[in-house]
Amino acid sequence: MLFRSVFSARYAGPDATYADNCVHLLAELDRVGSGPRTARFATSIVLALPDGGELDARGEVVGVITDVPRGSGGFGYDPVFVPDDGDGSTFAEMTPEAKHAISHRGRALRAMAEMVWEALPTARTQE
């Protein structure tokens, strides 16, 4: 199964809630049987520069899908995703700080911030 962009928000139907999407995903995984339940979240950020150039950053986190939802924090598929880089908690069980430290969005934003910092040498000299 592959979810892309806004389609993941409507996976269980046009009016589905986050919980509906998680339940639907788990039911689909049960239907296809046992096997690896690996998953990954990815985010790309592009910054258009005044000179026509672009900066492109990507963040990714790999993990597994749980058998049942766990936790009440976060949003979307957070209750069913356990990142490989974590402590065995789902994203929904983590504090926001712990999640953002390893999330795909956090990684992409940190990578973009580094690229912007390197692309703007005048900003470094004003500190």
Regions found by a protein language model. Name each.
Residues M1-E127:
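Anionic-ligand binding patches
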